[in-house]
Amino acid sequence: MDSLTQKLTVLIAVLELLVALLRLIDLLK
């Protein structure tokens, strides 16, 4: 796996985590 693919995978994982956090915060409001 080249570094670009690895960076994209990490970026997508981080974005999914952020979305999950935003949904949690929205539910807690």
Swiss-Prot record:
<keyword id="KW-0472">Membrane</keyword>
<feature type="transmembrane region" description="Helical">
    <location>
        <begin position="10"/>
        <end position="27"/>
    </location>
</feature>
<keyword id="KW-1133">Transmembrane helix</keyword>
<comment type="function">
    <text>Toxic component of a type I toxin-antitoxin (TA) system. Overexpression leads to cell stasis and a decrease in colony-forming units. Probably repressed by cognate small RNA orzP. Base pairing occurs between 18 bases in the 5' UTR of zorP mRNA and the 5' end of OrzP sRNA.</text>
</comment>
<keyword id="KW-0812">Transmembrane</keyword>
<protein>
    <recommendedName>
        <fullName>Small toxic protein ZorP</fullName>
    </recommendedName>
</protein>
<dbReference type="GO" id="GO:0016020">
    <property type="term" value="C:membrane"/>
</dbReference>
